[in-house]
A protein has these predicted regions:
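Hydrophobic alpha-helical transmembrane bundles of multi-pass membrane proteins
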Residues: 1-356
Length: 356
């Protein structure tokens, strides 16, 4: 379910629920199972032959899910109005920044349990070392690495984004993902320094993916999880080489980490791309433009996301930095997508009604 939840945020506002559920089943029940057997199991071929080291699933969970998501996004396409006629990206403001930041904080607290669950695989590979209840020493090691990873990620995200709230907190998430692969061997001070670079990398990668590749990743999942997930196993090859890994105690190495990256990247990306391409050809991947513009909550459930509050006009930030109401921008994008061939479609955007 973790891999599927990573994908969900990137696809919001335009993917069909049925298509997402099919992709989630494929990613969480097939692709992830395969890569976990290869590089996370103590008897996996990547660990026993090449010493691939990914203790808390930087690439096994986050990297593969990010690569899968990238493949889906290429077929799904951007949201209406995300890019102008020149291909420059616009920024959609969050409808509630407080809830956005609260959600990120809930993810942070969940990581403490997620790390503990990841260690169960080591109790299978090395019987008697750990148990499902863990121990005070193990819990302390988990907590300190996670905490330092978040702290460093916050620092890097804050500097790279110049204090942007979303990217500052996302940088904390990217930081802990960047040190997850070597969390069992890193010194806390090293984890802090490496996570700073991970937080900064997520911001730069997110901007590059949006502005250069023109891919609309609504929450930066590819940058935070995909890029930083593979960055995490890359760092192990540099800063944690020589540690015994797997049942055969093969030492970890830079080459072994690259081998794991070369196995996981195409596994995730090609699976997501091919599956979403088939759904696209069957016209099952994306909702119709008028449904996207109205909003999936309103179209499917006739229910606004905050029914207890009056809806206010939403805003969008243009490429030149000017903030304007989103309704005219989205209606213009809707006309471009439909080529003006859908007269009489009634839409409501940000509290404003219009007809095309």
């Amino acid at each position: 379910w973790t891999t599927a939840s990573i994908m969900s945020g990137a696809l919001i506002e335009r993917v069909r629920l049925s298509a997402y559920l099919l992709l989630a089943v494929l990613l969480g029940s097939a692709v992830w199972i395969m890569d976990a057997a290869w590089g996370w199991s103590g008897a996996g071929w990547l660990t026993t032959r090449f010493g691939f080291h990914d203790s808390i699933a930087s690439a096994v969970v986050h990297g593969v899910a990010g690569a899968f998501t990238l493949g889906v996004l290429l077929n799904l396409g951007p949201r209406i109005g995300k890019f102008d006629m020149a291909g420059r990206a616009r920024t959609f403001r969050a409808h509630n920044t407080h809830l956005t930041l609260m959600g990120l904080m809930l993810i942070f607290t969940g990581f403490y349990a997620f790390y503990g669950a990841c260690l169960v695989i080591q109790s299978i590979a090395f019987p008697g070392w750990l148990n499902i209840y863990l121990s005070p020493t193990t819990l302390g090691a988990i907590a300190i690495v996670i905490t330092f990873g978040f702290a460093g990620g916050f620092t890097g995200g804050w500097f790279a984004s110049k204090g942007d709230p979303f990217w500052t907190l996302s940088g904390g998430l990217a930081g802990v993902i960047s040190v997850s692969a070597g969390a069992d061997v890193y010194h806390p001070s090293l984890a802090y320094l490496l996570s700073i670079s991970g937080g900064m990398l997520a911001v730069y990668a997110g901007v590059w993916i949006e502005r250069t590749l023109r891919i609309d990743d609504a929450v930066g999942a590819v940058a935070v999880h995909g890029v930083c997930g593979f960055y995490g196993v890359f760092l192990v090859g540099i800063f944690a080489g020589g540690f015994p890994t797997g049942l055969n105690n093969v030492p970890s190495s830079f080459g072994g980490q690259l081998m794991g990256m070369m196995a996981f990247l195409p596994l995730g990306f090609l699976s997501g791309y091919v599956a979403s391409w088939l759904l696209k050809k069957a016209n099952l991947l994306r909702v119709p433009p008028e449904v996207e513009l109205e909003g999936l909550d309103m179209a499917e459930f006739q229910q606004d996301f905050f029914p207890e509050f009056e809806r206010v006009p939403e805003t969008v930030v243009l490429p030149d930095g000017e903030e304007v109401e989103s309704a005219p921008v989205l209606l213009e994008g809707f006309a471009q997508v439909t080529n003006g061939h859908r007269p009489g479609v009634r839409v409501e955007v940000g509290g404003e009604e219009g007809r095309r």
